[in-house]
């Protein structure tokens, strides 16, 4: 079965065939339209635009804009395929009960003749330091919500790990984080949580809160900022950080014990140049 799969994938990556182009475009357009009244996506898009005013992280969504979908260039798609679908820009991650010597020979048989190509040079985009608070209002039919976010460092850096730790101190399985204990469980708001995202370049740390009925966004914001102050002042139990670290280790071990988890860890490392 592995050889059949390799044969099919070799054909797929050898030549781009846009036979189903218009059918796929309709599917993408449908997803794009669904996103237009999804307040979670709309808020996220606005947040990313303000955090990254220069970088594609904030200036280019996965689906793009409506004008991109209205006039897609098949020539540009072919050019992108030819530029980036090259062996020195690819990784094949195979996990499972494999005979690795035989597997390597099969991979080499079907993919070994792919030619190395120089990748198009990309200039590193540097964002200016944030010196002031930027506010954006996003209109949607859903309940009010507030997101606060800070730009952080890239995936795998010390700062990204620290941002992940702070997110865990604030939101910990819905039970032991400061937001869990002091806001959610005390019913001071409908819901609140913290999270961090590390990208290949830069990252973000964010807080989200959904206020109760007749509670203003300004009041909800103060609830979040009060918990941030507690983190800054070390006002949380001594056992929390060691517990978070132990849980992170446990989750990592569990992930690596599954084929999907191991494969995801490997290709994630490749994508982020780690």
Regions found by a protein language model. Give the residues of each.
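Short, solvent-exposed loop/turn segments at the edges of secondary structure
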Residues: 85-88, 129-132, 140-145, 160-161, ...
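PPIase-associated folding chaperone regions across multiple families
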Residues: 21, 158-165, 184
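M16 family metallopeptidases and their MPP-like homologs
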Residues: 1-11, 40-67, 89-95, 144-154, ...
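Active-site-adjacent, His/Asp/Glu-enriched structural segments that form or flank metal-binding
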Residues: 1-41, 56-57, 68-89, 106-109, ...
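Surface-exposed patches in mature extracellular/periplasmic domains of secreted proteins
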Residues: 16-24, 119-120, 234-240
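Short beta-strand/turn micro-motifs at beta-sheet edges
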Residues: 78-82, 133-137, 191-197
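An aromatic/glycine/proline-enriched structural segment found at the starts
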Residues: 54, 62, 91-154, 255-256
């Amino acid at each position: 079965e592995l050889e059949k799969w390799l044969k099919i994938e070799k054909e797929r990556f050898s030549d781009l065939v846009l036979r189903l182009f218009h059918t796929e475009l309709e599917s993408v357009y449908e997803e794009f339209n669904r996103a237009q009244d999804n307040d979670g996506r709309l808020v996220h898009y606005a947040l990313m635009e303000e955090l990254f005013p220069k970088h594609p992280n904030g200036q280019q969504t996965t689906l793009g804009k409506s004008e991109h979908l209205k006039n897609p260039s098949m020539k540009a798609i072919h050019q992108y395929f030819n530029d980036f679908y090259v062996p020195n820009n690819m990784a094949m991650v195979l996990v499972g009960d494999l005979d690795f010597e035989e597997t390597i020979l099969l991979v080499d048989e079907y993919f070994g003749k792919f030619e190395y190509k120089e990748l198009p040079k990309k200039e590193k985009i540097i964002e200016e330091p944030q010196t002031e608070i930027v506010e954006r209002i996003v209109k949607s039919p859903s309940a009010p919500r507030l997101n606060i976010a800070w730009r952080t460092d890239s995936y795998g850096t010390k700062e990204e790990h620290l941002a992940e730790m702070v997110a865990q101190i604030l939101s910990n399985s819905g039970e032991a984080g400061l937001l869990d204990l002091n806001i959610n469980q005390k019913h001071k708001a409908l819901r609140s949580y913290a999270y961090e995202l590390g990208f290949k370049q830069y990252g973000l740390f964010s807080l989200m809160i959904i206020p109760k009925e007749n509670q203003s966004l300004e009041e909800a914001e103060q609830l979040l900022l009060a918990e941030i102050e507690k983190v800054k002042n070390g006002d949380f139990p001594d056992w929390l950080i060691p517990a978070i670290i132990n849980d992170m280790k446990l989750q990592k071990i569990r992930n690596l014990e599954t084929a999907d988890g191991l494969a995801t860890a490997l290709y994630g490392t490749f994508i982020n140049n780690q």
